[in-house]
From Swiss-Prot:
Lineage: Eukaryota, Metazoa, Chordata, Craniata, Vertebrata
Comp. bias regions, Low complexity: 91-101
Top-level taxonomic group: Eukaryota
Family: Belongs to the UPF0561 family.
Protein name: UPF0561 protein C2orf68 homolog
PANTHER family (alphabetical): UPF0561 PROTEIN C2ORF68
Biased segments, Basic and acidic residues type: 32-49
Stored Pfam families: UPF0561
InterPro entries: UPF0561
Source organism of this protein record: Mus musculus
C-alpha cells in the first residue's frame, strides 16, 4: 500500500504523502499553534512574576497590643512568681533583708504605674506589712506622703480581702 499512487488527473497529491503546505488552511493551523505557544509562555511568565511578588514582605501595619493573660498560681502552693517582672521587683525590694523571700505565702503581685508610664512590680506576701510594701514602691517611684498613705491603705484592703478568703 503506497500512498503515492497516482489516482488520476483530478487529484494533486505529491509523492511521499506529505501535506500541501501552500494551502491556506494548513497555514492557519500552524499560525494558531505558534500563537498558542506564545500565549502559554506569557501566562507562565506572569505566574512566575506573581509568585515572586508574593514573597516580598508586606508593608508593616499596626498590630494589636499584647493581651494580658491570666496565669494561675501553682497547685503545689509554691511561692514561685508567675510574672517575670514581679521576680525582678521582689529581688530588688527584698535586698535590704538577709532572706531572699519573706516567710509566708505569696498573695499577689502589685503593679504600680506612675504618671510617666513606668511600672513598678512588687510581690506581696501573706505576712507583709503594707507600710513596707508602699515604701518599696516609693523607693522605685518617688511618691509624696499623701500618695504613699493612699497606697498603704489600698494594700491593707487587698491584704485583708485575700487573707479572709484563705
Amino acid at each position: 500500500m503506497e500512498a503515492a499512487q497516482d489516482h488520476g488527473p483530478g487529484l494533486c497529491c505529491k509523492p511521499g504523502g506529505r501535506l500541501d503546505m501552500s494551502h491556506g488552511f494548513v497555514h492557519h493551523i500552524r499560525r494558531n499553534q505558534l500563537d498558542r505557544d506564545d500565549y502559554d509562555k506569557k501566562v507562565k511568565q506572569a505566574a512566575k512574576e506573581k509568585a515572586r511578588r508574593r514573597h516580598t514582605p508586606a508593608p508593616t501595619r499596626p498590630r494589636k497590643p499584647d493581651l494580658q493573660v491570666y496565669l494561675p498560681r501553682h497547685r503545689d502552693g509554691s511561692t514561685h512568681p508567675v510574672n517575670p517582672d514581679c521576680e525582678e521587683a521582689s529581688e530588688s525590694s527584698s535586698s535590704g533583708s538577709s532572706e531572699l523571700e519573706p516567710p509566708g505565702r505569696q498573695l499577689f503581685c502589685l503593679d504600680y504605674e506612675a504618671d510617666s508610664g513606668e511600672v513598678t512590680s512588687v510581690i506581696v506576701y501573706q505576712d507583709d506589712d503594707p507600710g513596707r510594701v508602699s515604701e518599696a514602691v516609693s523607693a522605685h517611684t518617688p511618691l509624696d506622703p499623701a500618695m504613699r498613705e493612699a497606697l498603704r491603705s489600698r494594700i491593707q484592703e487587698e491584704l485583708a480581702k485575700r487573707q479572709s478568703r484563705h
